[in-house]
Structures are given as structure tokens and as C-alpha cells.
Amino acid sequence: MKIFSTLLSQKPKGKLVIRPSTTIHSSDPFSKFIVTKNTEPLSLGDLRKSDSGNSAVCLNAENTILSTLTDLQKEEERNWDPVKFVAGKLRGVISPIQAYVTIGKKFSPNSLVYTSRFFQLHYFPEDHFMSCFRKSKPAITVKSNKKFYLNGKVFNKDKEYFNETRISKANEVELSKIQTAMTRLTNRHRNSIPSEFAYLRRDLKLKVKTTFIKEWCKLNGDKAIREYVNLNRSPNINPASMKGKPKKSFLDNLGRSTVGTAKDGYYLYIVSIFPDKDMLGEFNDEVNRSVQKVANLDWDGFLTPKKGTKGKNWVESFNDSINVQTINKILEINKFPFELRREQTEG
């Protein structure tokens, strides 16, 4: 029994880190492709209109022919939305890594942190394999699945909706009737699933990202990252000890965001029901609650695996399952000037 217990209690193989590629050489810094430990977070706190990215305005200032702003450009300036601007800067992870995980269905059940009738949210902390390749702080991907025709809003002969709740709870006979009704409808009208329309997918992403970044910044996620970055840049301060922190700190003694503070990392939303004008308010509330749920996670409790090898948290177990050689081959094929390494931890 003692030997068996020892076998189960194993230490992680090492921390996953990104290092310069030994095969692909480039003068471009990592920050052009992925975030680094010193990458600043996205924030709503210090935005100015000059940050709006209206390149036409900047070009006109230097162009004698187009020295005055057109009425259209003035209108764009007046209608500039700083929240949508920052939301537009939210990125996910580099596509080869996203494909590697999605196609291989390499999701840990521990990453699923929030479920609603609209979507599921998977959250991956910053030291998770996927977060190593995120393109913004925080990172977010909004995906949709082809679950319901017309968002489940299909009338039966009694003018009752075959909505998503009814579908999920239907017995075999009723489900057969629902499927028949939907098949007849979709045979007449192609592309009856919202996720098949590119403009609806774009609109969905903007809705999620706009609501997400407002709540994430409201919960001080940007301040926590900035605090850690500043401490990490200071040669005389060890981020692991965090002694002498400011009175209002958003980090604990291990340099992690405190409970109630929005977290850095990678957020993956998988949406089943697209919000229309009748349900947009409820949808936004659910997005807010999902961000709050992650912010309120206790790190030790969240990282403890539901089952698995003793001595490792679920992120370490997932990282240990990654074939580094395979990942580096994928990165090389896609011409990324960096590769994945395992950095041995002390102790």
C-alpha cells in the first residue's frame, strides 16, 4: 500500500515556458505573436480618444491635401466607443494551438467553470498550456456550436415554442416530433442555424467581448496584472514573496489575483443560443456572472483536481500530458519563431 501510494503521488514534470526557436529565426519579438510576462493588460482606465486607432485621422494631419477632417471622420470620432475599441483588441490563442486542442478534444473537465442556457465557459489559468500561447491579457475566444435551429424558436401546431429548455427535457416521442418539425422547416429554408451566418458570428463575438471586458475591468483584472508586471520588472522584489505590497493590493502572497479580483488567463466561451433583442439583457447578465464566477474562484480549491494523480493540480497534470515535441513541430510548420520547453521546478 505504501508503494502504491508513492506511485500515485508524483511531482509535475516541469513548468511549460516559451523560448526562442532553434530552427526558425526571426527579428520579430515574441510580443508580436503572443503575450510575455511583461505584456500590459487591456484596460478601460487610461483610454484616450487618440487611442482609437483612427489611422485616417493621423494620416490627414500629415497630408496637406487632406488636412481637414471630413464630416464622416468627425462623425466617427463623435461615435467612438472606448469599450468596443478595447473589446476589439481582445484575442484568443494562436490558431494552431487552438486547433490542436479542439480537434484532439483535449479539454479537462476541471476547466468548465460556468454553464448557462446560452453558453459554457472554460477557463484556463495563465500557467496552463493553452494560456502560454494567448495573444492578449486576458485572452478570449467565442465559439458557437450548431445546436438549435433558429435558436430553438420553432412553433408547433399549437403555437408553442420548441425552445431549448423543452428540447433538452423532451422524452423520446416528443423529441421525435420536434426533430420532424425542424427537419421540414430546414428543408424549405436552408441555413436556419444562426452560427452558419458570418455576420451573426461577428456580432456575437462583439457582444460577448464588450460585456466581458467591462465586467473584467470593473473587477480590477487590469490592475492586478499591472501590479504583478511592475513587481516583476523590479529587480529587488521577488514576485513570489510579494513583501511590502501596497495597501490596496490585488495579489496574494504568491502573486496570484485575490478572490474577487478578475483573473488573467484564457477564457473560452462556447455559445449555443445566440442572443436576440428579446434576450440580450439576460445574455449580458450571464456573461457578467461568468466573469464574476471566475473572479471569485479560490485558487487552491479550483486547482485541486476532481480526480487524478496526487501531488499535482489539474493544470500540472494537463501540462504533463502535452507532447512538447509535437507542439514544437506544429510551431515550426507554421513558422513561429519560438518553441515550447519544460523548465524544471525546484524541490
Swiss-Prot record:
GO terms for biological process: mitochondrial tRNA 5'-end processing. Keywords: Mitochondrion. The keyword Nucleotide-binding does not apply. Its main location: mitochondrion. Disruption phenotype: Mutants are deficient in mitochondrial protein synthesis. One of its GO terms (cellular component) is mitochondrion. It is found in: Mitochondrion matrix. The keyword Glycoprotein does not apply. Present with 721 molecules/cell in log phase SD medium. This is Protein PET130. It comes from Saccharomyces cerevisiae (strain ATCC 204508 / S288c) (Baker's yeast).
